[in-house]
């Protein structure tokens, strides 16, 4: 009995998709960090609206990080983290 389900995508194709998702995961991680930094450091007359906007954005990015990593795992590949890429 096979431990994986045949979804009609070859191993090579799954690897290519996972590699692309891995790059998306890395880019999203960078954007998450930068957005969080802006949230912490925003000043000025638009502080309240920008602070709230950045809060919403970094929380949504966090959810996206989890979703992207889980999609990589669903393809049967390990989700990259740290120096694993």
Residue ranges and their predicted role:
Residues 8-16, 31-56:
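Helix-loop segments that flank and shape redox-cofactor active sites
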Residues 24-40, 68-71:
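Long, well-ordered alpha-helical segments
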Residues 36, 84-85:
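Mobile beta-alpha loop/short-helix "lid" or hinge segments that flank ligand
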Residues 42, 46-84:
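Conserved alpha-helical segments that form or flank metal/cofactor-binding pockets of metalloenzymes
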């Amino acid at each position: 009995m096979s431990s994986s389900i045949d979804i009609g995508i070859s191993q090579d194709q799954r690897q290519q998709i996972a590699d692309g998702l891995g790059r998306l995961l890395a880019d999203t991680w960078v954007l998450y960090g930068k957005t969080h930094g802006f949230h912490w450091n925003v000043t000025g007359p638009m502080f309240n609206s920008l602070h709230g906007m950045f809060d919403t954005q970094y929380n949504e990015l966090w959810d996206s990080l989890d979703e992207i990593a889980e999609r990589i795992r669903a393809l049967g590949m390990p989700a990259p983290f740290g120096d694993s890429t």
